[in-house]
């Protein structure tokens, strides 16, 4: 695997592949990789001739009091994991390469509506930062397909919407959430959990499972949400939000919506954990 922070080197290699009629898959990450990221790389290998990944801790998507400085940087370990998984090209830019004029003078991308709720309401400007960096990386790499984890369900829909609205010529693939044996969704932020908190963190997925079963059995959505929130508080969480939405639009569900998604964000110790579950009723 070749690692570079130089935009022109990425473009030159991709052009060579394309000149040979070969396809390119892209997996953008913020590093500190876990099994979920490696699953994305392996799926990417099934969908294209070549796999490109990026590692960039994007300052534009972090709020003033969030964990930008504390976010783990583990480049050597990440390079080894990506190489073993079959990634061929790794882009590792610095903020001054991505945002040479600084964040305040940077052109940005905003996906209205879907970016403003749930995580967007809790983290103002977050999805502006996500959409901007993802579009910039797409312009640099020019992939045929890009892969994202379904754990970040709202992010996936924001990116799909951006790609559709801007007529970008690539496919967006959502890959199923990879979980630990307890059911906890794998996340780079799980490293913030103490051993005791990690044991209790499985209650998040359990609450989503119970809520989906209740709604499927006919329980009113509001009543099921109230019970799930109570279960999270009992387990030691501080819920940020727990909501049921249309699985396709993230709009509040109507009686006609049969495919639903429950989305949750909750604090446990220093960690803000998110998870979701798509279900039918």
From Swiss-Prot:
Chief subcellular location: cytoplasm
Listed EC numbers: 6.3.2.1
Protein name in UniProt: Pantothenate synthetase
Record's keyword annotation contains Cytoplasm: yes
Gene name of this polypeptide: panC
Location within or outside the cell: Cytoplasm
Residues that coordinate or bind ATP: 30-37, 149-152, 178, 186-189
Entry function: Catalyzes the condensation of pantoate with beta-alanine in an ATP-dependent reaction via a pantoyl-adenylate intermediate.
Alphabetical list of InterPro entries matching this protein: Cyt_trans-like, Pantoate_ligase, Pantoate_ligase_C, Rossmann-like_a/b/a_fold
Assembly and oligomerization: Homodimer.
